[in-house]
């Protein structure tokens, strides 16, 4: 059963489901379940979601929502994104009490990773 007034499921579109799945499996350890050739769902034990096959992508420039993940070691997460084939779309920058970077995954969806500012 879902919790009231909390995000329960998030759904993305992805042109290359296999590449997107592999990217997030290796980056965050998500577990996936395929539902045919055009849909795969994921869970990380706290939140669930899915990817449907489509040519559209979500970026800030296109007015898409920005999903922001947390990682305690920001530089390590950034390097992992690069190593797994992601592209850095905004390098590490500071904001009040934190730092973050933006990236696109293999299907072009833009996301971000943030961490506390170690100098704050």
Which ranges hold each PLM region?
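N-terminal first-folded block
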Residues: 6-42
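Vicinal oxygen chelate
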Residues: 1-3, 7-14, 58-120
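Conserved active-site tyrosine of GNAT-family acetyltransferases
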Residues: 20-24, 81, 108
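N-terminal beta-strand motif that seeds the catalytic metal site of vicinal oxygen chelate
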Residues: 1-21, 48, 65-67, 115-120
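Conserved short beta-strand elements that form part of the metal-binding/catalytic scaffold
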Residues: 30-63, 103, 110-116
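Short linear motifs in intrinsically disordered
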Residues: 28-33, 69-72, 90-93
């Amino acid at each position: 059963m879902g919790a009231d007034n909390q995000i329960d499921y998030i759904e993305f579109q992805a042109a290359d489901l296999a590449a997107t799945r592999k990217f997030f499996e290796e980056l965050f350890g998500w577990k996936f379940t395929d539902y045919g050739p055009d849909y795969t769902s994921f869970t990380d034990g706290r939140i669930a979601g899915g990817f449907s096959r489509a040519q559209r992508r979500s970026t800030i420039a296109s007015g898409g929502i920005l999903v922001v993940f947390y990682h305690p070691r920001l530089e390590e997460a950034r390097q992992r994104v690069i190593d797994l084939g992601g592209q850095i779309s905004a390098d590490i920058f500071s904001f009040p009490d934190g730092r973050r970077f933006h990236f696109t995954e293999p299907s072009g969806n833009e996301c971000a990773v943030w961490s506390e500012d170690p100098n704050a």
